[in-house]
A protein has these predicted regions:
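Ser/Thr-rich, low-complexity intrinsically disordered terminal regions
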Residues: 1-116
Length: 116
């Protein structure tokens, strides 16, 4: 049995407000993803992918932790159904696509600070 969810954290050297402006647009980098929530006050963005031939679909939660001139982004990708042996790799690929798009839109590199 595979892992149901994967969490990774990244640091961006930009203020939260600037990074959050790009957060919703970065969802487009994840194939077939639909934005379900973007709450600046709650410091969270959520989106999901539909069930398909090779996947039960995923729920993705992006949390923002503001710091002094930087922001840590914690992103969790979890399957909506039963995990399989390839789920962790699929989760990490979706996280990677989102973080790469967010980094490009913000104009700064993301540095990974933690992973599960």
């Amino acid at each position: 049995m595979g892992m149901r969810s994967t969490t990774q954290s990244f640091q961006f050297n930009v203020p939260f407000e600037q990074l959050f402006q790009a957060a919703s647009s970065a969802v487009q980098a994840v194939e077939k993803a639909t934005l379900t929530r973007a709450d600046m006050a709650g410091r969270v963005v959520t989106f999901d992918t539909p069930m398909g031939m090779m996947s039960w679909g995923e729920n993705i939660i992006v949390g923002f932790i503001p710091g002094e001139g930087n922001t840590v982004v914690e992103i969790t990708c979890a399957t909506k159904g039963l995990p399989n042996l390839m789920q962790d790799g699929r989760n990490r690929a979706m996280i990677g696509r989102y973080i790469t798009a967010l980094s490009n839109l913000a104009g700064v590199p993301a540095v990974e600070v933690a992973r599960s």
